[in-house]
């Protein structure tokens, strides 16, 4: 159904730069996220009359409660969205609202960029709908300002319609999800729910309880620099070591060659000189055994290269980042089945697929709160071609309301 102020909320949130900073050491990593929580979201929660509204300086989460209004609905359910946006220009976001999209090319402001169905066939799913796009110079921030707007709108609808009976609802708006550390300090005891949902998915119907298991691999290659004219038998080129290491990884296990349940090894950066070079990889897989095998392959290649040179030419550090939340959620599929049933009741076809990435729910699930992910509507996220459908956002609100009112 249509909801007053949903579009207005989203546009207002989207215009605020809340980009996170992977190089910062504070929590949240940017002051703009703190300001967004305290100056925008907290007053709105207060105006809605929620209880126990508090901002946790320890982790950057803004938390609030809407008490149950029916003693028979005893569940305590959480909804979580993140405040930060991805690593793309977020200053001066100027959304475009395209009403009754006709299926054609959408110019992104005067930037010279276009949303073209020839490049983005997913646009054909939205003919006749209201689309919100960028002006071509920034991202949109539907990931995850759409989720925040949907949660806020659901709360406002429940407060305005007390005849709708619902369980206790806890909401959490957190920082730094896009750089993978948003849930590191999540306070499970403070949030105090039976289960939760991240409202951080993509198109209509997405319902996800599987993520990658993830690790980061950092390598330092140690060379020996001598004059190239007399280098024979003496020079060890650290850049060549980095290339040799990379070439020993399976060539087919790259992101651009994988999909579905296939994992990958992704070389993110390679820098250096003859004397020293650095490579950074991310390692991703869904299954524990193959995840461990991937990490073991990295170690085996490093060991083999060091053995061949008779000394340490390759230093390798691997750090696990998060794990497939399926390991937790599949022990009790009730949160997934509940969301699935609500979607079906609303005529929405659930699209249950693995997330080829991670969510805050990955870590929160392992902390003790099962937290699958539901759609928020964003498409082509993290860049200038990002867009979201107002009608999909409305249906996300419908799903939230259905979940909290389901007996």
From Swiss-Prot:
Location of the active site: 84, 177
Record-listed Zn(2+) 2 binding positions: 143, 178, 382
Enzyme class, first EC level, given as a word: hydrolase
Subcellular location: Cytoplasm
Pfam families attached to this UniProt entry: M20_dimer, Peptidase_M20
Protein name (database record): Peptidase T
Record's cofactor remark: Binds 2 Zn(2+) ions per subunit.
Keyword field contains Cytoplasm: yes
Disulfides per UniProt: none
PROSITE patterns per the UniProt record, alphabetical: ARGE_DAPE_CPG2_1, ARGE_DAPE_CPG2_2
Originating organism: Streptococcus thermophilus (strain ATCC BAA-250 / LMG 18311)
Gene that this sequence comes from: pepT
């Amino acid at each position: 159904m249509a909801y007053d102020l949903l579009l207005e909320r989203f546009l207002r949130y989207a215009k605020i730069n809340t980009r996170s900073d992977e190089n910062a050491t504070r929590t949240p990593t940017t002051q703009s996220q703190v300001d967004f929580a305290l100056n925008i979201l907290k007053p709105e929660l207060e105006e809605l009359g929620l209880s126990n509204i508090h901002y946790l300086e320890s982790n950057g989460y803004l938390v609030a409660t809407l008490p149950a209004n029916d003693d028979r609905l005893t569940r305590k359910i959480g909804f979580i969205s993140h405040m930060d946006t991805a690593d793309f220009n977020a200053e001066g976001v100027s959304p475009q609202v395209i009403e009754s999209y006709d299926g054609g090319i959408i110019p992104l402001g005067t930037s010279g960029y276009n949303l073209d169905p020839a490049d983005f066939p997913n646009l054909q799913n939205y003919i006749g709908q209201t689309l919100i796009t960028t002006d071509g110079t920034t991202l949109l921030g539907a990931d995850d300002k759409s989720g925040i707007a949907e949660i806020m709108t659901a709360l406002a609808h429940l407060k305005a319609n007390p005849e709708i009976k619902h369980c206790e609802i806890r909401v959490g708006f957190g920082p730094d999800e896009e750089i993978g550390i948003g849930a590191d300090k999540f306070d499970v005891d403070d949030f105090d729910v039976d289960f939760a949902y991240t409202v951080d998915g993509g198109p209509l119907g997405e319902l996800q309880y599987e993520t990658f298991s993830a690790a980061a691999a950092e390598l330092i290659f140690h060379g020996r620099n001598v004059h190239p004219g007399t280098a024979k038998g003496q020079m060890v080129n650290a850049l060549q070591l980095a290339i040799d290491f990379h070439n020993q990884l399976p060539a087919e296990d790259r992101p651009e060659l994988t999909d579905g349940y296939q994992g990958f090894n992704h070389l993110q950066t390679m820098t250096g000189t003859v004397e020293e070079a650095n490579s950074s990889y991310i390692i991703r897989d869904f299954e524990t055994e193959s995840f461990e095998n991937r990490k073991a392959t990295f170690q085996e290649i490093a060991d083999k290269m060091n053995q061949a040179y008779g000394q340490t030419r390759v230093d390798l550090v691997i750090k696990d980042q998060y794990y497939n939340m399926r390991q937790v959620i599949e022990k009790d599929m009730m949160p997934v089945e509940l969301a699935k049933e609500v979607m079906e009741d609303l005529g929405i076809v659930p699209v249950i697929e693995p997330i080829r990435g991670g969510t805050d729910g990955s870590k929160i699930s392992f902390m003790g709160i099962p937290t699958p992910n539901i759609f928020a509507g964003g498409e082509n996220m993290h860049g200038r071609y990002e867009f979201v459908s107002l009608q999909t956002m409305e249906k996300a609100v419908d799903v939230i309301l259905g979940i909290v009112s389901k007996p």
